[in-house]
Amino acid sequence: GTTGALTIPFGDSPAGLFTDPPRCYMHRQATFIQSFIKDQYPDLAAGEDYDVFVLPSIDKEHGTPLLGAGDLVSAFNDTEEAHELMEFLASAEAQEVWVKELGKLAVNGNVSSEVYPDPITAKAAEILSEAEVFRFDGSDLMPAAVGSGTFWTGVMDYVSGKDLTRVLQDIEKSADEAY
């Protein structure tokens, strides 16, 4: 409920899945939540004790869009070295390092599912590769002062009962300053 949404620390939010009896049966979250689950429940097996699935489409006309985030790289100098670095970072070889060491999802289709460190991340990569529509999380595309600042606190303020018009004005003001 409202109290839980406002008071439970982010990393503790999946805990209800693992109580006896469970306090919840589903938890919508990004794949990185696994790091919190693994730290708090080291005896649980990914893919056996907990798993992931795609939320069904609201309207088949619009498909089943995936919402996510991503790390972006940019070249600011048009040099041979910059081009070589960009090509390397896009290669399966480089992305296998990200997958194995950081638990990230590869965007290079030549990265084998066998290199993923656990079944959840491998399944998430498969889901991503089969997606017809992908959209970046809007808050991740906003300047930090907005996306992880006033937008985040504004949502919490709204859930706690603050007037929506006031919340939106606060977010818009910070966006005007950030952009």
Tell where the protein language model's regions lie, with residue ranges:
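Helix-loop-helix "hinge/cap" segment bordering the ligand-binding cleft or interdomain interface
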Residues: 1-11, 80, 84, 162-169, ...
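Non-transmembrane alpha-helical segments in soluble domains
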Residues: 15, 83-90, 95-99, 152-156, ...
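Extracytoplasmic ligand-binding clamshell segments of periplasmic binding protein
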Residues: 1-39
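Extracytoplasmic/periplasmic, Sec-exported soluble proteins
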Residues: 10, 25, 29, 74-81, ...
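Flexible, small/polar- and glycine-enriched "cap/hinge" segments at structural transition points
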Residues: 121-122
